[in-house]
Amino acid sequence: MVKWGFSTIGCPDWNLKTAAAFGEKSGYPLLEVRVTGSDHPEKDFLRKLGEEKRCLILGTSFGVTTDADQYRDMLKSCATLAAECSIPYVRIFGGCGFSEPFDDEKKANAKRNLEYFESLGLPTRLILETHDLFSSGKRVCELFESTGRTLPVIWDTHHTYFTGKESLSESWELLESYIIDVHIKDGNGKELCLPGEGIFPMTELFALLKEKNYAGLMTCEHEKMWHPELPDMPEAFRAIDKFKGAL
């Protein structure tokens, strides 16, 4: 059975307690919490969510191909917070746009960053989102091959479909062994909207996950923090509710 949750970027005006309570009431009990460092204004409650296994992922903006000490320091800070709060995963990105080549310099930076993270000896694991440079399953596999390492994956289906230009089945076949979380959102490739109101093949996605017996995390990534014109979080929940029965 899949586990439902949402990202706190969908409710930037709510504190964690409000978000957790509303998510629990609405059938989306798990939270993906975005952080920027080890200081969090609700650290005690974040620890409670981690201990209750209601927060499994902290979201950072760290780009794995970035070569800058301050970004590695930020990653260490966020991962330390995750470890202190019993949160198993820290989300990372690619670090540059999909149109840029994944060249030897970026491959070397990625390997160095992953080696650095391993040297910290923290219990927390990195999890890669299909985002920016790695907005396709093919690119993700190139990263794994070039670094000699694999990572758990958040499959942002919107990015692989619109930016990576892969069909849902193509991305699934490439990433199936690594996916532990599926991000859901809708739009037309440029502008976002409520799930079911855009041109993303939502029905096809749910049918694919049903066929493959997917039983991981399902996260509503309603990007209201970045797109304040979007409806509020409750409307996003109601929109996804129309599809949940397919699983």
Where are these regions (language model features)?
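Hydrophobic, well-structured mid-protein blocks that either form specific transmembrane helices
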Residues: D103-R139
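Active-site-proximal loop/turn and secondary-structure-junction residues that shape catalytic pockets
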Residues: G10-P12, V35-G37, S61-V64, G94-F98, ...
